[in-house]
Amino acid sequence: PDKINFYSIESSNKICDLNISDYNSEDCKYTTLKRSELVKFLKKDLENVIKINHSISKIVQQNQKIQLIFENNETSECDHLIISDGVFSKSKSLILENQTPPRYNKTLAIRGTIPISQKINCRNISLFLGPDFHYVIYPVNQNGDLNFIAIMKYKLNKEEQKNHSLFNDANFIKRILDKVPIEMREFLNQIKKLKIFPVFVSKSFFKTKNNNIHLIGDAFFAFPPSFAQGASQSIE
């Protein structure tokens, strides 16, 4: 992409644009792709190093050494431990007593893939801003497929927050999509691989007592998405 174009959902008018090609160099350029494809690229030379289907059951800190004990009784010792397993970090819970759980941010994320559209500049990133609803559309391959990510304000009671199967329920999904601004219904009618999930955020920062243990990403602190921040982070 050469630009990020900002639009108003209510008026469909363009607000402004940011020419990101100004930040490109010959060997380092802005690009957009699916997160899953990025993960495949990053791990392609690490297949023999990454342990699949391993779950940590205990973290033992002894002086400057850290021992990991897995549920299959395997052990591993390291000098430094980087924890990056998301907002509901199991690893963080193993080293932190009385952990404050993340809170629901009264926000839902909607994600999927849509086909090429005459109404969208398919070469660039399009960011649409509206009251209680933002969404971003950007190209992910040379075939014209577009990634769609939206952030919507939506209240869930405590039972609904815990009910993971709710987000696969056809009636619930329809209820969510019916609240989407009418200006973008056309995109949702063509969306594939639709996923809807609640957004949880952190209440406080946590610093480990051991300087050899480092928390990063949402495991360290999950920020609330605002002004499509969550969608923008997905682009990055």
Which residue ranges define each predicted feature?
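Conserved N-terminal helical subregion
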Residues: 1-96, 100-113, 157-160, 167-170
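Conserved beta-strand termini and adjacent loop/short-helix elements that scaffold enzyme active sites
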Residues: 7-9, 53-55, 71, 130, ...
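Conserved FAD/dinucleotide-binding core of flavoprotein oxidoreductases
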Residues: 16-30, 34-39, 74, 116-196
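A secondary-structure boundary/capping signal
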Residues: 34, 52, 152, 216-219
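Short secondary-structure boundary/capping segments
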Residues: 42, 73, 99-102, 126-127, ...
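Structural motif
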Residues: 53, 62, 131, 140-142, ...
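Conserved catalytic motifs of the protein kinase core domain
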Residues: 77, 145, 211-212
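Conserved mid-domain beta->alpha element of the FAD-binding
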Residues: 82-83, 110, 137, 172, ...
